[in-house]
Structure formats: C-alpha cells, structure tokens
C-alpha cells in the first residue's frame, strides 16, 4: 500500500480554528494522509467526523490506519470530490455541521507516484487525474485543446507570462506528433520560454504543470462549489478552516469569505447601528491569514506558502 509522505502544515492552528466541540459533527474535506482527521478525532467524544477524498489510494490507506475510529463509528470515509459535500452528507441524513476543514496542499502519494504524470521531475505518461475514473486527462488537454484555450489556462491558472509562446510551441509540436510524456511536455515548455527567463524563478515547467493540473481536475471550480455548500451547511457557532498553498486558491477563499462577512450593499454608510436583518451572518476569525511559525518553516519548506483563513457563522440567515 502506498505511503503518505505529506507533512501536515498548520495542523494545530487549523484544528484549533474549528473550536471542536466533543459532541459535534465535523468534516475533513481533504482526507489525504489523515493528519487533520486524526487531530479532530482526538477531540471528539460522542461526535462524528466525515472525511472526504476522491482518490481511492487515500481511502484505502486510511481504512487501515484509522480502522479503530471507523469501528467505533466516530469516523466515516467518503470517496468523492468535495464539490459533492452536501449531497454526500445528505445521504447520511446530515443537514448541518459544526465545522469543516480544507487542506488544499498536495497530500497524496499520487504526486510521488511518477506513473500518475503530475511531476515535471519524473518522466511518465501525461495524466494528472486525481480521480482515475474521470475521462479528461492532461494528454487530452495538451494535445486537443485549441491554442486560445491553452493560453487562457496557462495565464489564468499558472500565472505564466509566457503563456502565448508556450501554447504556440505546444500547438506546433503536436502537429508533428502527439505529446505523450511529461518530459516531452517539459521540453516544449522550455522552448516557449526565453533562455534568460529560464535561468530564474525555479523550474521553467512549474507554472504550466500547475495550470494543466488545475484544468484537468477543475480544482478552482470544485473549491468554489464546495465552499458555497460548506457555508450553507454550518450551524450557528460553526467554523470553516481553509489552508491554501497558492495565490489563486487563497484569492478565491479570501473573496468568498469577504462577501459573506461584509454588510449588504443596501446598508447606508455611516449608520451608528446596523438595522436588524442587515448584519452579516458570518465573521472572520482572523482578519489576516495565519502563516506558519519560524519553527515550522525551518522544519518544512512547504510551509512558506501556506495561509490559513477561518470564518464563523454567527447567526441564521443567508
């Protein structure tokens, strides 16, 4: 069975942010190696935790490692994308929860498994599917999507300033022969980036691989849908903790949380008291994102990009 090498970042801060109640109902939307799930379980007495992952590897791993909690009926593992949060919980007759945690970092051996095609460091067939059951793969994106669509995803999801020249090189190469492996794609990406730019800013394929992975798995679309459902599922006093590792995800979370905690546009400015029914139903627990301590940064280089945002439901209403 595959081992999970992922070191959980901001573990204590994210779980503490949920303010776990011993008899509450909680969701770990990103099971992965089970780090956050275990930390939440330690605080539950008669409560229940539903942990989601669309990757069969993660489910199988945790069935074995968290067997006791499952047998004690404290834990339910759900094999599905977290964009189906509400439907899955509804199937267990769960209408409201006390807290939901998201760790959007890479936490599965799928990224360490060269055969899955996520890494520009290992040669493998182009794949990048987190859910092996889905049809769309990186092979199709790279070889079949039109130039304009490639430019769009490279720029939007990879924030790649050489998106046009990279997309043009991909288009030219695939006319000769399909791009079938990660190393073939890396070579094409390098051709699309000026030599001077390749010498700075890390691996030249990093941004493009991120963009293609996000497109293949519709990561931002899934996150937005899931957070909308999560906010709706919360009981009063319930919280959502979200750990992001890249600016696109953090921007989305920040924007959605700001919308939920801001006054309605109908409220006149400068009122000494906000009229009843117009107050926000949510509040931010931390105005600025929580970041890793110096100690954690020294122990785990991945923690440098981690940001934790927490929101609480303070009253009923939409």
UniProtKB/Swiss-Prot annotation:
InterPro entries named among the record's database cross-references: RsmH (IPR002903), SAM-dep_MeTrfase_MraW_recog (IPR023397), SAM-dependent_MTases_sf (IPR029063)
What reaction(s) does this enzyme catalyze? cytidine(1402) in 16S rRNA + S-adenosyl-L-methionine = N(4)-methylcytidine(1402) in 16S rRNA + S-adenosyl-L-homocysteine + H(+)
Q: Which GO terms describe its cellular component?
A: cytoplasm
List the subcellular locations.
Cytoplasm
Keyword line: Cytoplasm, Methyltransferase, rRNA processing, S-adenosyl-L-methionine, Transferase
UniProt GO molecular function: rRNA (cytosine-N4-)-methyltransferase activity
Per the UniProt entry, what is one GO biological process? Answer: rRNA base methylation
Record's SUPFAM superfamilies? Answer: Putative methyltransferase TM0872, insert domain (SSF81799), S-adenosyl-L-methionine-dependent methyltransferases (SSF53335)
Q: Which Pfam families match?
A: Methyltransf_5 (PF01795)
- Per UniProt, S-adenosyl-L-methionine binds at 34-36, 53, 82, 103, 110
Asked if Membrane is a keyword of the record, the answer is no
**Enzyme class, first EC level, given as a word:** transferase
E.C. code:
2.1.1.199
Give the family, as the similarity comment puts it.
Belongs to the methyltransferase superfamily. RsmH family.
| Matching PANTHER family | 12S RRNA N4-METHYLCYTIDINE METHYLTRANSFERASE, S-ADENOSYL-METHYLTRANSFERASE MRAW
Q: What is its biological role?
A: Specifically methylates the N4 position of cytidine in position 1402 (C1402) of 16S rRNA.
Q: Which HAMAP family match?
A: 16SrRNA_methyltr_H
Q: What is this protein called?
A: Ribosomal RNA small subunit methyltransferase H
This protein's species is Limosilactobacillus reuteri (strain DSM 20016)
What's the name of its gene? Answer: rsmH
């Amino acid at each position: 069975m595959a081992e999970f090498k992922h070191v959980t970042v901001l573990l204590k801060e994210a779980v503490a942010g949920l303010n776990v109640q011993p008899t509450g109902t909680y969701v770990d939307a990103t099971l992965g190696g089970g780090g956050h799930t275990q930390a939440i379980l330690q605080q539950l007495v008669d409560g229940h935790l539903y942990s989601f992952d669309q990757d069969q590897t993660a489910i199988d791993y945790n069935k074995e490692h968290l067997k006791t909690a499952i047998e004690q009926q404290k834990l339910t593992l759900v094999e599905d994308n977290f964009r189906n949060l509400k439907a899955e919980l509804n199937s267990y007759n769960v209408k409201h929860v006390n807290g939901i945690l998201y760790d959007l970092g890479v936490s599965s051996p799928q990224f360490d498994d060269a055969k899955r095609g996520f890494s520009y460091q290992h040669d493998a067939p182009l794949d990048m599917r987190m859910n092996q059951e889905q049809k769309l793969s990186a092979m199709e994106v790279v070889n079949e999507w039109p130039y304009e669509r490639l430019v769009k995803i490279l720029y939007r999801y990879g924030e790649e300033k050489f998106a046009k020249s990279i997309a043009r090189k991909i288009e030219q190469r695939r006319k000769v022969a399909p791009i079938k492996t990660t190393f073939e794609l890396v070579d094409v990406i390098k051709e699309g980036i000026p030599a001077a730019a390749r010498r700075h800013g890390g691996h030249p394929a990093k941004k493009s691989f991120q963009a293609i992975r996000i497109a293949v798995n519709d990561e931002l679309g899934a996150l937005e849908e899931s957070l909308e459902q999560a906010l709706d599922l919360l009981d009063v006093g319930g919280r959502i903790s979200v750990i992001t590792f890249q600016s696109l995800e953090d921007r989305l979370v920040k924007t959605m949380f700001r919308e939920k905690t801001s006054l309605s546009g109908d409220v006149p400015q400068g009122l000494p008291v906000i009229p009843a029914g117009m107050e926000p139903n949510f509040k931010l627990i931390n105005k600025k994102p929580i970041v890793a301590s110096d100690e954690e940064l020294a122990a785990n280089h991945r923690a440098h990009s981690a940001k934790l945002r927490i929101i609480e439901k303070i009253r009923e209403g939409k």
